[in-house]
């Protein structure tokens, strides 16, 4: 039985991967009167007088909403909200397993930006954080921006920022392995959607040299016509030498390639014209170039999104710890500095003496990562003055 059929059978057997468990046993009349009527009226009265008490008297202090509209689910595309539910449930299971953060999946049956924003805002008082998931670009940028302005809890689009954080962590260690200079790198990112643009911004904010964005038409340059707002924004801070051409042109002399695009777009010949290249080919399930081909082309370090190859670059290293840290100090938001510190925290999980071309990033199953990331995020929130406890 292949992995797809095995997963399908597991889902049929389980009828869902998550469930709600009561934290209070209700076995006596007294239990009932404390957990529900009449006793429950008192915490209601306290919250009505002081909104902040909702974080102390209910579970929202440790509860994240995992929300999609089903328009960009994995590599499946626009499959609708109901079909996105297995992914949202899986995400919730990972929150609990790796960070002991409770999470609840919500799938919104709308593609209208205003409707999605209003729906999420109206339910936000039930949660301590909002994890946006699998929402197509460019709509995802506006949805996140507006919700961050409206909500008083962290809003985090994991496809953007989770991916960016873990890629930066892997790149920090790959730079050490290859003895390159972080600030002098030429980095080519193929795929100018939600993940690619977020990776580009994050790497630039961290001081990773010159980032060149590419899409289906080739290199993106400031002043190009037909760019969406996200691409237009990053065009002003990337491709500092105003290069033009196709992906192969961008890769000449490049130190790193980061792919968040489509399978089999890169050849070993293209890798061979890089500068002792770092290759992160993260298209799933088939990467832009297979690791053996990249290595044959002269790549120094290769990472993918897959668990069956070394250096799996996976968001599960990010979102459990980021939210655990933010929730622990009641942070109002997840800032750029918090994201940068998260990248350094993940990178630190591999000591320098253990770094090799096949070992630049912690295993996604390493449950110590979430606590290290959480501490970095929480400490940064306190430092920036956005913690509320």
Question: What spans do the regions from the language model cover?
Answer:
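Adenosine-phosphate binding glycine-rich loop
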Residues: 158-159, 281-389
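N-terminal ligand-binding/catalytic initiation module
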Residues: 1-155, 380, 384, 388
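Glycine-rich phosphate/diphosphate-binding loop of Rossmann-like nucleotide-binding domains
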Residues: 74, 81-99, 157, 161, ...
């Amino acid at each position: 039985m292949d992995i797809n059929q095995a997963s399908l059978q597991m889902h049929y057997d389980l009828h869902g991967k998550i469930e709600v468990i009561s934290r209070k046993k209700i076995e006596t009349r007294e239990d009932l009167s404390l957990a529900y009527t009449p006793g429950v009226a008192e915490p209601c009265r306290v919250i009505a007088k002081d909104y902040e008490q909702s974080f102390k008297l209910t579970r929202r202090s440790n509860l994240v909403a995992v929300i999609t509209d089903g328009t960009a689910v994995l590599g499946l595309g626009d499959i609708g909200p109901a079909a996105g539910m297995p992914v949202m449930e899986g995400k919730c299971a990972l929150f609990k397993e790796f960070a002991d953060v409770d999470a609840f999946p919500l799938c919104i049956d709308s593609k209208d930006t205003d409707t999605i924003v209003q729906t999420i805002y109206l339910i936000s008082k039930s949660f301590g954080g909002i994890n946006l998931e699998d929402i197509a670009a460019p709509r995802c940028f506006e949805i996140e921006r507006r919700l961050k302005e409206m909500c008083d809890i962290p809003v985090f689009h994991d496809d953007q920022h989770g991916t960016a954080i873990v890629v930066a962590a892997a790149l920090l260690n790959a730079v050490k392995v290859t003895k390159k200079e972080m600030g002098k790198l030429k980095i080519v990112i193929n795929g100018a959607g939600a993940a690619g643009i977020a990776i580009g911004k994050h790497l630039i904010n961290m001081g990773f040299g010159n980032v060149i964005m590419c899409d289906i038409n080739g290199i993106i340059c400031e002043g190009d016509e037909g760019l969406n707002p996200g691409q237009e924004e990053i065009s002003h801070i990337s491709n500092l030498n105003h290069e033009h051409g196709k992906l192969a042109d961008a890769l000449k002399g490049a130190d790193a390639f980061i792919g968040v695009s489509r399978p089999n777009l890169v050849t070993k010949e293209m890798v061979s014209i890089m500068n002792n290249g770092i290759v992160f080919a993260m298209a799933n399930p088939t990467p832009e170039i297979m690791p053996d081909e990249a290595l044959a082309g002269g790549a120094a370090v290769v990472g993918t999104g897959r668990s069956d190859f070394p250096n799996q670059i996976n968001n599960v290293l990010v979102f459990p710890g980021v939210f655990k840290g933010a929730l622990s100090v009641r942070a109002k938001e997840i800032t750029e500095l918090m994201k940068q510190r998260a990248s350094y925290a993940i990178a630190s999980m591999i000591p320098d003496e253990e770094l090799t071309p096949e070992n630049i990033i912690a295993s996604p199953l390493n449950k110590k990562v979430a606590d290290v990331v959480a501490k970095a995020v929480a400490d940064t929130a306190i430092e920036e003055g956005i913690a509320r406890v």
